[in-house]
Amino acid sequence: MAAVRGVRVVGTSPGLLLGRGMRAFLLLLCLAARGGALYFHIGETEKKCFIEEIPDETMVIGNYRTQLYDKQREEYQPATPGLGMFVEVKDPEDKVILARQYGSEGRFTFTSHTPGEHQICLHSNSTKFSLFAGGMLRVHLDIQVGEHANDYAEIAAKDKLSELQLRVRQLVEQVEQIQKEQNYQRWREERFRQTSESTNQRVLWWSILQTLILVAIGVWQMRHLKSFFEAKKLV
């Protein structure tokens, strides 16, 4: 089973080329784009996994709903409540932080405690129901990360906040999320630097080892030739 990854941007580390202001601006753009809806098809025993890069201490909310393919109508219809989805989430250290059975439509929530790539997997329990066995499901999934996971309308009603107070709270939480993203980028840069240094060190030691092997082979060949010539009384 291959994990389905999101779109990634690969390039020079922003910490090397960009100032703090530009970095914060780019992170704000990234935050504005975090989270989004998609749908995918899944078979009877098939598992679909997604990789999401998440900073530490960040809340993630996923909303999903399933549709079952109707062969007679040749279209997808809302799945019955008996059809469920099993959701499993693993952190970058491959530890399970969420494993739970949900219904045909539901919402799952978890908070990251380790920065890095989190694996979110879903698969159906269709094998338990002969009616659905062998059918094809369409799963609509919406994952929200960080402050995008907050329902500000609900927060405003619960805490009785004015429009200005709510906006200030949104800005504060956006700044906090930007700080988390910056810390995560620094962590990635540090990890990349350590990996590069380790690789360079291994290459250096391997080059030294190769040189020593070549020198040893050369010395052995010279001694072998000298012994050969002495045996033939050529020297």
Swiss-Prot record:
GO molecular function: syntaxin binding
Motif COPII vesicle coat-binding per record, residues: 228-229
Main subcellular location: endoplasmic reticulum
Gene Ontology BP terms: COPI coating of Golgi vesicle; endoplasmic reticulum to Golgi vesicle-mediated transport; Golgi organization; intracellular protein transport; positive regulation of organelle organization
UniProt xrefs under SMART domains: EMP24_GP25L
InterPro entries to which the protein is assigned, alphabetical: Emp24-like, GOLD_dom
Keywords: Acetylation, Coiled coil, Endoplasmic reticulum, Glycoprotein, Golgi apparatus, Membrane, Protein transport, Signal, Transmembrane, Transmembrane helix, Transport
Protein modification: N-linked glycosylated containing high mannose.
Region of interest (Required for interaction with STX17), residue spans: 121-160
Membrane topology label: Single-pass type I membrane protein
Domain GOLD: 47-145
Protein known as: Transmembrane emp24 domain-containing protein 9
